[in-house]
Curated annotation (Swiss-Prot):
Site residues, Important for tRNA non-discrimination: 30
Native source organism of the sequence: Thermosynechococcus vestitus (strain NIES-2133 / IAM M-273 / BP-1)
Keyword Cytoplasm: yes
Protein name as annotated: Aspartate--tRNA(Asp/Asn) ligase
Span list, region Aspartate: 202-205
Length: 605
């Protein structure tokens, strides 16, 4: 019977006999004495097999190799002072093995080194193909433990401190409009009809409020068939919450307490309260994004009023057509960023055009205070306009001013992208800093140019500000996002709880009465039976853990993630299925299914 985990043995255990199980992380033979680093999920401990002191265990120690599974029985000893390893939690002790039992061996060449001492860079495709081995590695095991501790902290706060109850909502539900693409599941017993996997528990958690649940939470699995990137997965996990009889201030206050509890429990960080707040409009004006990273400055400056009558038509024309001109002021940028990078073919020009800009104008403030720019700008701005630009932006000698001119959304996207690029290049981001803030007062709707209609900026169940009820199309939403170092980690709102108002919102986004009844009739009917005021929030667990772990991708914080092509390299999913299965489901494929078999990666050298 195991007495200890490997990483838990300490000086207090010196003189006792312990029984450990684990994997051989590393084996070393020093002058006939064999040293074994034994690893389990808790960490590593050093095992010593000395033929003079423990002759019975020595033959087994000789045959050990990396990743053999073993049982070790031995006596805990204090290490000599010159062999203490401060890098290990168990570095003050070692265990002299009285007995070693090999429980399993490795029958194939390892595709990559597991031991952290090897410090081997492994291609992600290989890691995902052999994910069960990747999860043995220290960094990945640490991420899984961190994820567990975050969820544990969430549960304890919500249940013990805030009176929430956990309720599971259905995985098989119905497809509804106004979201990403659904994953669909055909019904065998109802031919021609389909379930959808939930993109969120939104409607069910609102129904739980109608049911009198009052305070609900769930660690919910959600599914969205959308294009993937570094922090997106087709299936993901969120902390889902809903509360009755609470206004926005009460919800934000409770959630700040929750986040502070998580950070203190998991990272030992005391967060100051209350969290800063920005309105959506202020965030867009100052940073060009509704999820600004406030660990550094580089705020945008609107200079449209200064340049609306300028002779430079790129500026004045953009403003005349309803657009804006903004500046990204970069201290010390004049000497550090060359013209080559700003002009066509340069990396900053490419960043700007990728975001939709047609070009990238600039002004340099030389060390002598003189302005340097292209002739078309220098010749078409008055001395007063030049002086006002320098005053408005606070430009000093050495500043570089990058301009965005055009449609507001494009300008914001361009300068936000450049702001992030410059911050990384100039090392302006403190990786140890923790900046959290709320973004509030989002618009209820945004214009979808492709479909030529208004659509809900968040979702159509978000309640408008009471003072904006006179014109819902321009109303602000009672919505809020939590931003952590430039990443949205949570978002929520107060909900509509009156059926008449809900129907008005549906109508604005193009859902007529017949469609509303077909898709959401059950919700509208529930609202007829005394629905309490309610609101909620959902946190992206995968993304939150990624940021807490300092990982580059949420794939590093999920046990078995999909690739950016929505494939599981370990199991080969998605895969073709037998024709009989499709027949039973009354599904006819549009074309023959292609094989999804992948070439097995070669073991690493």
């Amino acid at each position: 019977m195991r007495t200890h985990y490997c990483g838990d043995v300490r000086l207090r255990d010196v003189g006792t006999t312990v029984t450990l199980y684990g994997w051989v992380d590393r084996r070393r033979d020093h002058g006939g004495v064999i040293f074994i680093d034994l690893r389990d999920r808790s960490g590593i401990v050093q095992i010593v097999s000395d033929p003079q002191r423990t002759p019975d265990a020595y033959p087994q120690a000789e045959r050990l190799r990396s990743e053999y599974v073993v049982k070790v029985v031995g006596r805990v000893s204090k290490r000599p002072a010159d062999s203490v390893n401060p890098k290990l939690a168990t570095g003050d002790i070692e265990i002299y093995a009285d007995g070693i039992e090999v429980l399993n061996t490795v029958r194939q060449q390892l595709p990559f080194a597991i031991s952290s001492t090897e410090n081997e860079e492994v291609r992600e495709e290989v890691r995902l193909r052999y994910r069960y081995l990747d999860l043995r590695r220290e960094r990945m095991a640490r991420n899984l433990r961190l994820r567990h501790r975050v969820v544990q902290a969430m549960r304890r706060f919500l249940e013990d401190e805030a009176g929430f109850i956990e309720v599971e909502t259905p995985i098989l539900t119905r497809s509804t409009p106004e979201g990403a693409r659904d994953y669909l599941v055909p019904s065998r017993v109802n031919p021609g009809e389909w379930f959808a996997l939930p993109q969120s528990p939104q409607l069910f958690k609102q129904l739980l409020m109608v049911a009198g649940c009052d305070r609900y939470y769930q660690i919910a699995h959600c599914f969205r068939d959308e294009d993937l990137r570094a922090d997106r997965q087709p299936e993901f996990t969120q902390l889902d919450m809903e509360m009755s009889f609470m206004d926005q201030e009460e919800i934000l206050d409770l959630n700040e307490a929750l986040i502070c509890h998580i950070f203190k429990t998991v990272k030992g960080i005391e967060l100051p309260r209350p969290f800063p707040r920005l309105s959506y409009q202020e965030a867009m004006d100052r940073y060009g994004t509704d999820k600004p990273d406030t660990r550094y400055g580089l705020e945008l400056v609107d200079v449209s009023d200064i340049l609306k009558d300028s002779g430079f038509k790129v500026f004045s024309g953009a403003i005349a057509q309803g657009g804006v001109v903004k500046i990204l002021p970069i201290p010390n940028g004049s000497d550090r960023i060359s013209n080559v990078r700003i002009k066509p073919g340069g990396d900053l020009f490419q960043e700007a055009t990728t975001a939709g800009a047609k070009g990238l104008a600039y002004i340099r403030v030389r060390n002598n205070g003189e302005i340097d720019t292209i002739g078309a700008i220098k010749d078409n701005l008055s001395p007063e306009q030049k002086a006002l630009l320098l005053e408005r932006t606070g430009a000093q000698p050495g500043h570089l001013l990058l301009f965005g001119a055009g449609e507001t959304a494009t300008v914001n996207k361009t300068l936000d992208r450049l702001r992030q690029t410059i911050a990384r290049e100039f090392n302006l981001i403190d990786p140890t800093a923790t900046h959290l803030l709320w973004v509030v007062d989002f618009p209820m709707f945004e214009w979808n140019a492709e479909e030529k209609r208004l659509e809900a900026l968040h979702h159509p169940f978000t309640a408008p500000h009471p003072e904006d009820l006179g014109d819902l199309k321009t109303a602000r939403a009672q919505a809020y996002d939590l931003i952590f170092n430039g990443h949205e980690v949570g978002g929520g709102s107060l909900r509509i709880h009156q059926p008449e108002l809900q129907r008005q919102v549906f109508e604005i986004i193009g859902i007529d009465e017949a469609t509303a009844q077909e898709k959401f009739g059950f919700l509208l009917e529930a609202f007829e039976f005394g629905t309490p005021p309610h609101g909620g929030i959902a946190y992206g667990l995968d993304r939150l853990v990624m940021l807490l772990a300092g990982a580059d991708s949420i794939r590093d914080t999920i046990a078995f993630p999909k690739t950016q092509q929505a494939r599981c390299l370990l199991t080969g999913a998605p895969s073709s299925v037998e024709p009989q299965q499709l027949k039973e489901l009354h599904v006819t494929p549009a074309k023959p299914a292609k094989t999804t078999a992948k070439t097995k990666p070669r073991p690493a050298d």
